[in-house]
Amino acid sequence: MTKKVFIFSASTGAGHNLAARSLAEALQGRGYDAQVYDAFKESSAALNRIVTKGYKQLVEIAPKLYEQMYHQFNKMTPFQQNIFKVMSKVMNPEIVPLIEKEGPDLIISTHPFVTNMLGTLKAHGAFNQPVLSFVTDYKIHSVYLHPMIDAYVVGSEYTKQTMVERGVSPDIIYPFGIPIRTEFMDAPSEGSEKGDPAVRGTIMVM
């Protein structure tokens, strides 16, 4: 029987969605039924506008304020935790019935907000499937961290170490790298295709 995987992301910057699509493509190529969902778009139109458009406008118009908010949420005080509890309740009406109806074998998140909210929903008994978080940032942010997340895939040993320093068990952190599109996996450089000995390889700037 084909294993079913749900991959949740959010449209705050293209990177999280691109990672989700890259994962789905890789899993589908290995025989999994992998589906990508925008967690906010699938749940609440109002929340989706606030998170996606609000994020974009904040970064463009008030980058200093965004920086302050970034560092404030990195502390994850009870106040910040309560915000995510409220957000998880807004997300709940559509996401949880979808999980109950389709019964995925694994749930993956490529976005820190979604990771935290899925952990909160799982903590309240909304579902019991394992949740895997793909950390698409090299420097960990506290929003990614939730005790109900079963495993993390991170981009480097450095990221793993910063998570261990914050109390996450090293046994559930896997420094396998950040997902990329399959066409980049074995893409030869233009020079190497032409047999240019001066070209040693291809560098992808992220």
Language-model features, listed with the residues they occupy:
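Short, well-ordered secondary-structure micro-motifs
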Residues: 47, 144-145, 185-188
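Conserved N-terminal ligand/cofactor-binding loop architecture of enzyme catalytic domains
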Residues: 22-96
